[in-house]
């Protein structure tokens, strides 16, 4: 564990081992989120995969972390998306004021309303290959200590290895079966189905269709996932202007 003090190694390894013991493959990301909360001065954690045009929420330590994960997917903006795009950590240590609040004003407002004041996003991978992010949430503003950053990086590395090792393709049947993915991830298939339907209804590109979904979801105070479900069940229709 590069950067982790010798005296902390056994404690970190023990917590991770406790959390993942007897876990099914699809449970591993959620268990590692729980380990991150136990090991770090944070109130929540989530993990998202890097998807086509938007992140795919995979697992979270609780309802609030899952909600904030969905908020970024809906807005298409936030520190976690920046980390996925750059392959570098993004630490928003104070979403209530200053630089962080001005960089992501809408997300910062939504996070603060949910009681989160700081978000720390670590890439799962690096600048050359980034498969997603580990996102950490804290109720109070402030920077992570160096030891905590080292621990967070290690948990992110473990998550990266775990995600790459999860069965997929022929090992787990068709990807669409969601045999290893959590419900959060498989539910996001509906977003891509809705993008296709909006493309057909409005005669627009995939990027434009996703932008329309996001704009309508935000205007209605909903997540893009909830709106997508209405689109594919024909409850909501997008008509060309």
Sequence positions of predicted segments:
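Intrinsically disordered, low-complexity terminal regulatory regions
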Residues: 1-75, 154, 229-241
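Short hydrophobic/aromatic beta-strand element in the GNAT-like acyltransferase core
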Residues: 44, 108, 121, 133
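Regulatory sensory and allosteric helical modules in signal-transduction proteins
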Residues: 50, 58, 65-102, 109-117
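Short hydrophobic beta-strand micro-motif common in sensory/regulatory domains
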Residues: 118-125
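Short beta-strand-to-loop transition segments that serve as allosteric relay/switch motifs
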Residues: 133-142, 147, 163
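Allosteric cytosolic regulatory segments
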Residues: 149-160
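Signal-transducing coiled-coil/dimerization helices and immediately adjacent hinge/linker segments
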Residues: 168-241
């Amino acid at each position: 564990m590069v950067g982790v003090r010798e005296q902390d190694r056994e404690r970190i390894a023990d917590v991770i081992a406790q959390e993942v013991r007897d876990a099914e493959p699809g449970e591993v990301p959620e268990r590692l989120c729980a380990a991150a909360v136990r090991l770090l001065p944070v109130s929540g954690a989530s993990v998202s995969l890097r998807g086509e045009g938007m992140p795919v929420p995979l697992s979270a330590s609780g309802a609030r972390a899952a909600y904030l994960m969905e908020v970024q997917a809906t807005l298409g903006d936030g520190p976690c998306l920046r980390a996925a795009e750059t392959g570098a950590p993004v630490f928003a240590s104070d979403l209530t004021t200053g630089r962080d609040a001005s960089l992501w004003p809408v997300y910062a407002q939504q996070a603060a309303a949910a009681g989160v004041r700081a978000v720390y996003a670590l890439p799962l991978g690096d600048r050359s290959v980034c498969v997603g992010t580990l996102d950490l949430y804290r109720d109070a503003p402030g920077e992570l200590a160096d030891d905590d950053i080292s621990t967070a990086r290690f948990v992110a590395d473990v998550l990266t290895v775990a995600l790459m090792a999860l069965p997929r393709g022929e090992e787990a049947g068709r990807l669409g079966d969601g045999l290893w993915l959590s419900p959060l991830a498989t539910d996001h298939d509906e977003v891509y189905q809705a993008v296709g339907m909006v493309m057909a209804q409005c005669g627009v590109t995939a990027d434009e269709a996703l932008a329309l979904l996001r704009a309508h979801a935000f205007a209605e105070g909903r997540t893009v996932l909830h709106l997508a479900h209405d689109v594919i069940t024909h409850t909501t229709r997008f008509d060309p202007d």
